[in-house]
Amino acid sequence: MFASLRRFQATPAYGALLSSLKVDLKKAMIAKNNMEKTTIRSILSTIKNNEIDGGAQTEFELSKVLGKMVKQRVDSAREFQQQKRDDLAEIESKESEIIKKYVESLPVASDEEIKEKLTHFLNEIKANDANTHVGAIFKQINDDLASSWGAAPSVIKSMVPSLYKDIFKK
């Protein structure tokens, strides 16, 4: 019962990606594409484990989880290449490419885009009041602003201190 309730709270992009993954899994099974099949199953398993752990069901959380999976695959491929295991490195590289395809399909802004928007936002605040305290800026960053930027509030808030120093301490 609770799983269905949690799925109800998921964002549309979250549900769309899950549907896409399930359709792609079925296609990979029909085509007998084992690489894609096992990678998609791994993605679905990781997402399910994240849901069980109580993770938010948003595109931002999915981006974080899938980004972590890509990083793990890239690191593993590098390790395998150092150990002269090119066969295993190739498998990890292919898996990371498959996962990247799904990360790119999410409507999430890149760090550069967020930084650019945040810089513009902070410059507007400075133009209105050059003595604005960083705490007041944190209060202005809410879920609505974050979703309109295509970013998680936590990602935006993690960038505020360094940009605040650059802009307000000039």
UniProtKB/Swiss-Prot annotation:
Q: Name one GO molecular function term.
A: carbon-nitrogen ligase activity, with glutamine as amido-N-donor
Cellular component terms per the entry's GO annotation: mitochondrion
Query: Per the annotation, which location comes first and is thus the protein's main one?
Result: mitochondrion
Q: In which compartments does the protein localize?
A: Mitochondrion
Q: Which UniProt keywords apply?
A: Mitochondrion, Transit peptide
Q: Please tell me whether the keyword Transit peptide is annotated for this protein.
A: yes
UniProt KW Electron transport keyword: no
Q: Which PANTHER family match?
A: ALTERED INHERITANCE OF MITOCHONDRIA PROTEIN 41, MITOCHONDRIAL (PTHR28055:SF1)
Q: Which family does it belong to?
A: Belongs to the AIM41 family.
Write the protein's name: Altered inheritance of mitochondria protein 41, mitochondrial
> What organism is listed for this UniProt entry?
Clavispora lusitaniae (strain ATCC 42720)
- Gene symbol here is AIM41
